[in-house]
From Swiss-Prot:
Organism, as annotated: Oncidium hybrid cultivar
Record keywords: Carotenoid biosynthesis, Chloroplast, Chromoplast, Membrane, Oxidoreductase, Plastid, Transit peptide
Catalysis performed (reactions): 2 a plastoquinone + 15-cis-phytoene = 9,9',15-tri-cis-zeta-carotene + 2 a plastoquinol
Annotated metabolic or biological route of this protein: Carotenoid biosynthesis; lycopene biosynthesis
GO biological process: carotene biosynthetic process; carotenoid biosynthetic process; protein homotetramerization
GO molecular function: FAD binding; phytoene dehydrogenase activity
Name under which the protein is recorded: 15-cis-phytoene desaturase, chloroplastic/chromoplastic
Places the protein is found: Plastid, Chloroplast; Plastid, Chromoplast; Membrane
Gene designation: PDS
Family matches, as InterPro entries: Amino_oxidase, FAD/NAD-bd_sf, Flavin_amine_oxidase, Phytoene_desaturase, Zeta_carotene_desat/Oxidored
């Protein structure tokens, strides 16, 4: 998971959770799916029924709470109503950009655009090109959608994911995308809080609660001032003074801090060291999976800027199930409904060029080739660098890519034999030297819901020294850290809660490593090569390495292609049709 994310007037949603999609009893699942009461609950989840109690007769479920005499039960979850995001400036700007594709003049000859990579950047590019009346041909190397939000199902029917993905209110393009697809109800919004473990008090947590009655930035200031467990008043004052130049100088000041690490900036601004220990280490690991002595301060300031400027910016939501099915497939269905193509198991092996150094075709690993009017690389930057043609390597924008490299990260999933009590229906900052953030997904996510057993999903970072270690070593180290977070429930030797199974997902090159002086190296979506474009969170956009950054990069890439329509249809490349040749 990477981030850019109480006194709330929203009441907790008190609703019946559907049995996980991995229910071993297909007949029971069909019974639930056919029952009209479930359809009613699903249809109303994010509307009039928020904050109400549903009583539904038991349909073969295990009891989670004590049932009443009439055979009904109540299951409590902490989902909150969707926050009011639609009137924020950033949301409206994102909505305007989305509308520009739908409202654009229909092309006489739709462009056939070949896109490599079906992560969020590639899916976004294809979606908005299709909205503009063009035909995207999206190629995914693997057999699963999503790229860095991919997930897989094991033999037991349980999903395990590439990362712990959190959706913030400060993600305007992502929030617009959910609305455009009609899937806003798939986001499970949580209480507006940030919750940190207390390393010096094993098993205890400290909270920053954002009051709903105050506008930004006062709700954030209130949350910080009310928390007296992590920083003293003196430290808070010095921290605030250190941040004053960012508040006064705005975006130009933020961009100028790209040359400094977080620690260097703190020293320059006279910010106490304990602010690093109590706040910035956790933020740095959540934002970019690295520590403050490596992370560019620009990254921290951008996140703080979003959280302090937008009332609901730091409010978080979990997706209600696995990302490939619950988010990526609706995008694919939208693309296909407008005439686009999406192909799995289609790995680009080579970018073959014309004599003028423009792209002639993509050669796939099975020997087939595909041609089009324009080409997009929406893969991680490390894959682009591997496949970059020799003829392009002396071009300055491609040379600068050498500064950009993906950061390693590990995602750990642990299934226990019991329900853990010392957790929340929320994202938790572990403040562990080995772990970043974690969540009990059996509580926070509907599809993974389990009334009897906990499933912890944890981000193991920084991972440089662990990426080559065995899965068992990583799990053993994780359990030792969890014994500090759950001292009464988890022991490293499993003498308490028993580990039923685990999955470890290693990503040697994840989002680009946001170290100092990276900003000038990030390329625009439109390259100097006519008809060749880039998408990905490493490309130039204001949300850095995040899901929001990936989606926005795809929109900007699609915008560049639409703007270049006349140039593209007039070239020889435009005379070729996009089709597969074996």
């Amino acid at each position: 998971m990477n981030l850019l994310g109480s006194i709330s007037t929203g009441f907790p949603c008190i609703s019946l959770h559907k049995k996980s999609l991995r229910d071993e009893n297909p007949a029971r699942k069909r019974l639930i799916d056919m029952d009209p009461r479930w359809n009613k609950l699903r249809a109303s989840r994010s509307s009039d029924y928020m904050g109400c109690i549903f009583e539904v007769p038991l349909l073969g479920f295990s009891k989670v709470k004590s049932s009443s005499a009439n055979g009904s039960m109540q299951v409590f979850c902490m989902d909150y109503p969707r926050p009011e995001l639609e009137n924020t400036i950033n949301f409206l700007e994102a909505a305007k950009l989305s509308a520009s594709f739908r409202d654009s003049i229909r092309p006489k000859k739709p462009l056939e655009v070949v896109i490599a990579g079906a992560g969020l950047a590639g899916l976004s590019t294809a979606k908005y090109l299709a909205d503009a009346g063009h035909k995207p041909i999206l190629l995914e190397a693997r057999d699963v959608l999503g790229g860095k939000i991919a997930a897989w199902k094991d033999k037991d029917g349980d999903f395990y994911e590439t990362g712990l993905h959190i959706f913030f209110g400060a993600y305007p393009n992502v929030q617009n995308l959910f609305g455009e697809l009609g899937i806003n109800d798939r986001l499970q919004w949580k209480e507006h809080s940030m919750i940190f473990a207390m390393p010096n008090k094993p098993g205890e947590f400290s909270r920053f609660d954002f009051p709903d009655v105050l506008p930004a930035p006062f709700n954030g200031i209130w949350a910080i001032l009310r928390n007296n467990e992590m920083l003293t008043w003196s430290e808070k004052v010095k921290f605030a003074i250190g941040l004053l130049p960012a508040m006064v100088g705005g975006q130009s000041y933020v961009e100028a801090q790209d040359s400094l690490t977080v620690k260097e900036w703190m020293k320059r601004q006279g910010v106490p060291v304990r602010v690093n220990d109590e706040v910035f280490i956790a933020m740095s690991k959540a934002l970019n999976f690295i520590n403050p002595d490596e992370l560019s301060m620009q990254c921290i300031l951008i996140a703080l800027n979003r959280f302090l400027q937008e009332k609901h910016g730091s409010k978080i939501a979990f997706l209600d199930g696995n990302p490939p099915e619950r988010l990526c497939m609706p995008i694919v269905e939208h693309i296909r409904s407008l005439g686009g193509q999406v192909e799995l198991n289609s790995r680009v092996q080579k970018i073959e060029l014309n004599s003028d150094r423009t792209v002639k075709k993509f050669v796939l690993n099975n020997g087939s080739v595909i041609t089009g009017d324009a080409y997009v690389f929406a893969t991680p930057v490390d894959i682009l660098k591997l496949l970059l043609p020799e003829e392009w390597k002396e071009i300055s924008c491609f040379q600068r890519l050498n500064k950009l490299a993906g950061v390693p990260v590990i995602n750990v999933h642990l299934w226990f034999d019991r329900k853990l009590k010392n957790t929340y229906d929320h994202l938790l900052f572990s403040r562990s030297p080995l772990l970043s953030v974690y969540a009990d997904m059996s509580v926070t996510c509907k599809e993974y819901y389990d009334p009897n057993r906990s499933m912890l999903e944890l981000v193991f970072a920084p991972a440089d020294e662990w990426i080559s270690r065995s899965d068992s070593d990583i799990v053993d180290a994780t359990l030792k850290e969890l014994a500090k977070l759950f001292p009464n429930e988890i022991a490293a030797d499993q003498s308490k809660a028993k580990l039923l199974k685990y999955h470890v997902v290693k990503t040697p090159r994840s989002v680009y490593k946001t170290v100092p002086n990276c900003e000038p190296c990030r390329p625009l979506q439109r390259t100097p090569i006519k008809g060749f474009y880039l998408a990905g969170d490493y490309t130039k956009q204001k949300y850095l390495a995040s899901m929001e950054g990936a989606v926005l990069s795809g929109k900007l890439c699609a915008q560049a292609i639409v703007q270049d329509y006349d140039k593209l249809v007039s070239t020889a490349v435009g005379d070729q049709s996009a089709e597969m040749f074996v």
